[in-house]
Amino acid sequence: MVLSRKRARHVIEEIIALFPDAKPSLDFRNHFELLVAVMLSAQTTDAAVNKATPGLFAAFPTPQAMSVATESEIASHISRLGLYRNKAKFLKKCAQQLLDDFDGQVPQTREELESLAGVGRKTANVVMSVGFGIPAFAVDTHVERICKHHDVVKKSATPLEVEKRVMDILPPEEWLAAHQAMIYFGRAICHPKNPECDHYPQLYDFSNV
């Protein structure tokens, strides 16, 4: 049974309280590197991405440099990541689009970001919120699993439904903190198998809600 808005907000804010200092775990120094790192993180751990990106960014530090590289050259730096051939293809095309459509700059709106090759709603939301400080809520596998496990949404909810529900429950200034905290919570506590959430009864203490 899906929780009420007040109870769902309580659960999420207790998760934020467990990880108040949660920060992005991808390494990046600018908007282009953030965009590339998030694109690479699909079906791959952030730790694996962070091992690959120093060499990738040293070789191709700008959209211009990446656009003139071959797919094979790009792929050689990310070959240990999942779906690396497809990712190399998307990175090259995305870099060219940045040059052609956005003067080599990473755009800030969801519509413009999603016009780029290999960029879906989750990636756009991460770039907007982490890179530009624009309120957005990204739903990855951790966030979706946690929201379903704790009845914030129904078990059949789509990622978009999860996103809209959390954005309805929380004020915009808490969206990024919730996203980051849920990732840490998912890695450390709310595992796909054998979740340890019961060790944190404060999540379910609705006496003051």
Show which residues each predicted segment covers.
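Catalytic cores of DNA base-excision repair glycosylases
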Residues: V2-V209
